[in-house]
Amino acid sequence: MDRSDTNRGTPLFTFPLLLQTAKHHIPILIGIAVAARLAMFRLDEVIFSWRSTDMASIALNYYRNGFHFLYPQVFWGGNGPGYVEMECPIIPFLLALLYRLFGVQDWLALVIPVTSGVGLVVTVYLFSRHLFDPAVGFVAGLFTATSPPLVALSTALWPDPPMVFFGALGLYLIVQWVETNKWGYFVFGASAITIAILLKLTALYLGIPLLYLCYVKYGSGLWKSASVWLLAFLILILPCLWYIHAHTLYREYHNTFGILSGGFLKFATAEVLLDPGFYGKSLGRMIFYHFTPLVFVVFILGIMVSQRDRLHYTFHVWAVTVLLYFLVAARGVSLGHFQYMLPVVPPGAALAGYGTLLLLRKLESVPSLARWPKGTWALALALLYLGGTVVAAHVYQSPEMYTTKMWAHDKRTGLAVGRLTAPGSLIVVVDNQMGGPPDGIMTPPNVFYFSDRRGWYLAMSWLTEDLIEQKRREGARYLVITANTVATFEESCPQIQGYLTARYVPLLDSEEGLLYDLAPGKEGATKSDRPN
């Protein structure tokens, strides 16, 4: 039986008519989602951040070096091929195929994130409509369509919107299987969740709501069901094979995104979990950015109301699981990497949609408020929500944000290096973004991508004269001090700067950064030798 339009415990609500008329819900939500992305969209920032430039670099390497799917390559792999341990490179591979069809153009990097973001809006609507009713679905879809972090991440090349989309789609299809026992839902639901885990290993958190749905279907005897074990096998077999392969790439080539070993690991440490500031900052980001204040209030209202049966608690279990996942990925969350908190949007929006109708019903029952024109109610709530959303988007995506300014400076440095260095040459990029040991950091890829050069990354704290000479012997032709680091470098490393200036020709000394030609002796790089 199709229960998408039946009442599943949602409070009665008599206005406005748009919420009750499902016919045009999906086109309206798609229109709102597209409009929100157009409002936030900036072509020069589609490929801009660390993760975006890494993904675009891998896509370029597929496009240029052959479509060898199992061997993703980064630009910062030194003088080697740059094969890297990472999540399954589905997105950069598809982007490379788009490059093959249409040429290398930045706007192509929008296709997958935008499609995933809009797809998530539709999925949340259908899911919420199915478990509650069309009115809840529409409000949940509206909250998803205008969610500040989802809008921001789906207008740039990030893997998180596709991961969250496929995870939500998979759970929705598995709910359909639980109710109907149709194997098409089973297979496609398992496939969607497999893709989510391939895109990001952290999507393993979906296992808890999946286990809950199996419990709804089979009760305490779920362990005896062959379907449950088959579901687990179908979901996990490809991710296991991929991540085993990815780890072999790390062991051989020593490049990693920090997903399994080496690099910066985002997982919790005792220090982070015992820090009260972690919880305060994370809660603040969730209230003011991922939800916005009004949505957070109705989310709390929605999650506190009891439901009529076990299946209705799917969103509750999903939301609580995401909160537990924040603790698992606490180190990444603590640094303000808001993409780690994106999975809260779908279950949060669904419960907030339910809570919104509860709130409106309660307000409608107050005699002094019931006399207000219904259009006034709708306008007041819409303005309150819109205000919180616009403020959140402005604050967190402002050009004055530290990371935005840092990435902008890296882009300027990279473009300058691309102009001044020989194509195909190897570079050494030095900055102060990373200060830990080499095997415990992320590698900033921006300068490599925007210069279209390969090479090595060195944190300024590691820099020595011997290390510079070692990289030169390994093939480095140029050394770059990024625009973000010039002032600190000149203040903290005058001896190394003097060494470089005495031995090598400076090709750049400006607000775009410092650039030295590491050809042997100053006579090795006269002005006539410099690239135009």
Residue ranges, per PLM feature:
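Short helix- or helix-capping micro-motifs
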Residues: G31-V34, A140-A145, I193, I197
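Extracytosolic helix-loop segments that constitute the early lumenal/periplasmic catalytic or substrate-binding loops
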Residues: L38-R42, S52-Y83, I90
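Transmembrane-lumen/periplasm boundary regions of multi-pass, lipid-linked membrane glycan transferases
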Residues: D54-N65, L206-L311, V322-S334, G387-T389, ...
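Short acidic/glycine- and proline-prone juxtamembrane loop motifs at membrane-interface regions
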Residues: P149-M163
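Short periplasmic/luminal acceptor-recognition loop of GT-C membrane glycosyltransferases, typified by
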Residues: W407, V417-T464, R472, R477-A487
